[in-house]
Amino acid sequence: MSGRGKGGKGLGKGGAKRHRKILRDNIQGITKPAIRRLARRGGVKRISALVYEETRAVLKLFLENVIRDAVTYTEHAKRKTVTSLDVVYSLKRQGRTIYGFGG
């Protein structure tokens, strides 16, 4: 247990962070213009008003899956820092291989 601080080996079982801001409704940070820009890049001309909430929901689900896998890789390697390779491997596991980030 040397060099691990008071958290021990279990990554999610450390002491509580003292000034941790509670994150709520951050998905609204993906703004309407940001979604519109992504759609424009994909060749979309007009966008229905219902698209924005649906896009946020799908993006949240996608990121939850990628981050869950990346954190699993990190925990398996007994690290506390998620690396770009963890994300690359988690995307590869989901069938979305990307290049240019190592691995």
From Swiss-Prot:
Keywords on record: Acetylation, Chromosome, DNA-binding, Hydroxylation, Methylation, Nucleosome core, Nucleus, Phosphoprotein
UniProt-recorded Gene Ontology molecular function terms: chromatin-protein adaptor activity; DNA binding; protein heterodimerization activity; structural constituent of chromatin
Compartments where located: Nucleus; Chromosome
Annotated PROSITE patterns: HISTONE_H4
Residues within the DNA-binding region(s): 17-21
GO BP terms, alphabetized: chromatin remodeling; nucleosome assembly
GO cellular component: nucleosome; nucleus
Modified residues (N6-methyllysine): 6, 9, 13
Residues the record lists as N6-(2-hydroxyisobutyryl)lysine modifications: 9
Residues modified to N6-glutaryllysine: 92
Major place of residence: nucleus
Signal peptide segment: none
Disulfide bonds: none
Modified residues (Phosphoserine): 48
Assembly notes: The nucleosome is a histone octamer containing two molecules each of H2A, H2B, H3 and H4 assembled in one H3-H4 heterotetramer and two H2A-H2B heterodimers. The octamer wraps approximately 147 bp of DNA.
Family label: Belongs to the histone H4 family.
Protein name: Histone H4
Organism: Schizosaccharomyces pombe (strain 972 / ATCC 24843)
Gene name of the record: hhf1
